[in-house]
């Protein structure tokens, strides 16, 4: 309903219009306001899932639950360059109204990219089909995926060839804790399977444990043990009051604690609240009734019996009581030292008695008729020496980091002469001779080429020369054909063969 003021304005407006028309009767003019009520439609109704079956700890409903798939991020062996000209062909007619100079420039750029790709393909085909191709020659992965010239070199970097970045949905699909593991799986890593080319071993990674909240660097980690729940020291005996020894220490509201450090040191209190995010505890002190906030690792959980006995005992805080406690600690240390000294003295007397007894037995044994037979001596059980595998003309790897300050570490050399079963003379690739090289400083090498010769250094066929026919890198084995047994094939471990660079009968 219109207000009286608006009604008066409307009447005055009608009078003015009638006067301007010379007293003529004018058509009535009316004003109105329209208001529409828009009802917001409710969202999509929630779909309900009904329980159908229970198998052990698994619940089955009407909607099938998708099992989580193994997350694997595949390794990119070859870059896929982003071609903008292909996307431009799919654009609508509105985008074709661009300036002619811009369209011409885009066409020139796409043509340049096409020519660069064709030229690189020609070089690659020429290298593959060339007369002198080394099968062991490998191009690094970064060089294979190198960006064509003219795009990301110089002062101005053009990233038009790069693909579009990942979306937020892609990031949400891959959890942070599973990202590194997914990349390793894409590179071929498998759980409980060793990695490497020659000696595969399943090495357990070092998992760093998260430091508890509120415990900064340099803090005493042993304080965490005091917060562990109490465990009965011995089973209860008949007649013991049940529940005294079995009282569990809980870090929660109502728990009894003693402050170990800070302004309220040695005071007792009860926990009123716990802030796990910041690692702090709200404690109400027994003396004074003050509520304070203390770091979690500065308190010690105590039993109800200890709390009732010492919580309001003010004599504990006096200087005389502290001096008495220190004196008790000193007496306990003295008693421990005396016990240790007494044990040492008793041990000395026992050893002297045993020595005299052994001397008497030795004299009696010498005077007896069986003194010619020596008494059975207890030999120290030392580990058996490693089997010798050194042979002349073997190509080996030096693995001793301490020799000559690590100068020859991880370098390859040739065995020139074998002095003893475990020492030899080696020649480096530069021609330098190294004397008195021990076997434990060296490691066998398996040749990469099948055309190279190998020698069996351990086992039944030690000293035989042959060639590798097939390799099993997963099990670190090789199928070998020896020159002496041309019609037979042997399967040998990598540890029993070594690269041989000496002369052969062929």
Curated annotation (Swiss-Prot):
Entry keyword annotation includes Transcription: no
Compartments it resides in: Nucleus
Any GO BP annotation: mRNA splicing, via spliceosome
UniProt cross-references to Pfam families, sorted A to Z: G-patch_2, GPKOW_C, KOW
InterPro entries, alphabetized: G_patch_dom, GPKOW_KOW1, GPKOW_KOW2, KOW, Rib_uL2_dom2, Spp2-like, Spp2/MOS2_G-patch, Translation_prot_SH3-like_sf
Residues annotated as domain KOW: 250-277, 447-474
SUPFAM superfamilies named in the record: Translation proteins SH3-like domain (SSF50104)
Coiled coil: 303-346
Gene3D superfamilies: 2.30.30.140, 2.30.30.30
UniProt GO molecular function: RNA binding
UniProt biased composition (Basic and acidic residues): 1-24, 83-101, 237-247, 310-359, 366-381
Keyword terms, alphabetized: Coiled coil, mRNA processing, mRNA splicing, Nucleus, Repeat, RNA-binding
Domain of life of the source: Eukaryota
Keyword Mitochondrion in record: no
A GO cellular component entry from the record: nucleus
Sequence segments annotated as region (Disordered): 1-28, 83-110, 211-247, 310-389
Annotated G-patch domain residues: 176-222
Oligomer and partners: Component of the minor spliceosome, which splices U12-type introns.
Family: Belongs to the MOS2 family.
Role, per record: RNA-binding protein involved in pre-mRNA splicing.
PANTHER family from the UniProt entry: G PATCH AND KOW-CONTAINING, G-PATCH DOMAIN AND KOW MOTIFS-CONTAINING PROTEIN
Name used for this protein in its record: G-patch domain and KOW motifs-containing protein
């Amino acid at each position: 309903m219109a207000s009286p003021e608006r009604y008066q304005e409307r009447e005055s407006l009608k009078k003015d219009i009638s006067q301007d028309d010379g007293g003529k009767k004018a058509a009535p003019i009316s004003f109105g306001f329209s208001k529409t009520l828009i009802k917001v439609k409710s969202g999509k109704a929630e779909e309900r899932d009904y329980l159908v079956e229970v198998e052990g700890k698994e619940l089955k409903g009407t909607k099938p639950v998708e099992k989580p798939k193994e997350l694997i991020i595949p390794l990119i062996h070859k870059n896929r360059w982003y071609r903008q000209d292909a996307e431009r062909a799919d654009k609508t007619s509105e985008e074709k109204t661009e300036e002619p100079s811009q369209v011409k420039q885009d066409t020139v750029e796409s043509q340049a990219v096409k020519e660069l790709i064709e030229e690189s393909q020609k070089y690659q085909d020429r290298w593959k089909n060339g007369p002198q191709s080394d099968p062991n020659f490998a191009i690094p992965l970064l060089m294979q995926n190198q960006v064509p010239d003219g795009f990301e070199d110089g002062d101005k970097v053009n990233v038009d060839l790069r693909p579009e970045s990942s979306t937020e949905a892609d990031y949400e699909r891959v959890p942070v804790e599973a990202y590194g593991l997914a990349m390793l799986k894409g590179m071929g890593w498998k759980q409980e399977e060793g990695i490497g080319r020659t000696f595969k071993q399943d090495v357990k990674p070092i998992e760093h444990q998260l430091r508890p909240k509120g415990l900064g660097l340099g803090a005493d980690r042993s304080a965490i043990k005091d917060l562990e729940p109490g465990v009965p020291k011995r089973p209860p005996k008949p007649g013991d009051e049940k529940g005294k020894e079995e009282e569990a220490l809980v870090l929660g509201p109502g728990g009894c604690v003693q402050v170990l450090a800070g302004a309220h040191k040695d005071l007792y209190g009860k926990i009123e609240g716990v802030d796990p995010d910041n690692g702090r505890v709200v404690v109400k002190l027994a003396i004074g009734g003050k509520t304070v906030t203390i770091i979690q690792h500065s308190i010690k959980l105590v039993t109800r019996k200890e709390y009732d006995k010492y919580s309001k005992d003010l004599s504990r805080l006096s200087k005389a009581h502290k001096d008495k406690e220190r004196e008790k600690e000193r007496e306990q240390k003295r008693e421990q030292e005396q016990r240790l000294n007494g044990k040492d003295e008793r041990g000395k007397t026992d050893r002297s008695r045993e020595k005299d007894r052994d001397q008497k037995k030795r004299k009696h044994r010498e005077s007896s008729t069986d003194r010619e037979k020596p008494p059975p001596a207890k030999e120290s059980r030392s580990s058996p020496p490693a089997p010798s595998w050194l042979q002349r003309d073997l190509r080996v790897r030096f693995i001793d980091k301490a020799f000559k300050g690590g100068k020859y570490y991880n370098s390859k050399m040739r065995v020139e002469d074998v002095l003893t079963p475990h020492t030899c003379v080696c020649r480096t690739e530069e021609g330098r001779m190294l004397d008195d090289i021990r076997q434990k400083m060296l490691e066998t090498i398996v040749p990469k080429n099948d055309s190279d010769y190998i020698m069996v250094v351990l086992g039944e066929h030690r000293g035989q020369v042959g060639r590798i026919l097939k390799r099993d890198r997963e099990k670190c084995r090789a199928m070998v054909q020896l020159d002496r047994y041309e019609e037979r094939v042997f399967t040998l471990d990598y540890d029993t063969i070594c690269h041989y660079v000496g002369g052969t009968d062929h």
